[in-house]
Amino acid sequence: MRKLFILSVVGLWLALALTACGGDAAEAPAAGASVGDAVAGETLYKQPVIGTASAPGCATCHSLEPNVVVVGPSHAGVATRAGNYLAGVSAENYLRESILNPNAHVVEGFQPGIMYQTYGQELSETEINNLVAFLLTLK
């Protein structure tokens, strides 16, 4: 009887501990949801000029169609590729760094220095977050 009591107490304690540590999977945000507004990011992405110095918009140099190169690589499937380029670097961090420091991760076959270099100074943090959120939807 004592053994049953001890097992019950341990089982109850484990159940409470697991409940306290775990979150509800249904509450997990969608990809990009915690980063920014993907709809606003798409709007910004498609504008021909962006930022305080009227820099070229993303769609000026990047296509959303697979294997279509305008100036830079296609962004079709970029969220998936971004998560696989560097071990230990999330897609979100890879994409953000690629906007803030374009020469940090130059895709094979493309030259460094081609991408506009000062988006980090010309776009607000919110605009960058929104662009990253949109890019994370491109799987």
Language-model segment annotations:
Residues M1-V10:
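Bacterial N-terminal signal peptides that target proteins for export
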Residues A17-A20:
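C-terminal motif of bacterial Sec signal peptides marking the signal peptidase cleavage site
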Residues G22-T52, V89:
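Electrostatic cytochrome c docking/interface patches
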Residues D24-E27, V68, T137-K139:
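Inter-heme linker and motif-flanking segments adjacent to c-type heme-binding CXXCH motifs
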Residues V35, A53-S54, A59-L100, Q117-Q121:
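Gly/Gly-Pro-rich "capping" loops immediately C-terminal to redox-active cysteine motifs
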Residues Y45, H62, L100, L136-K139:
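Protein kinase-like catalytic domain
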Residues N93, I114-K139:
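C-terminal capping alpha-helices of c-type cytochrome domains
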Residues H105-F110:
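Substrate-binding/catalytic groove segments of enzymes
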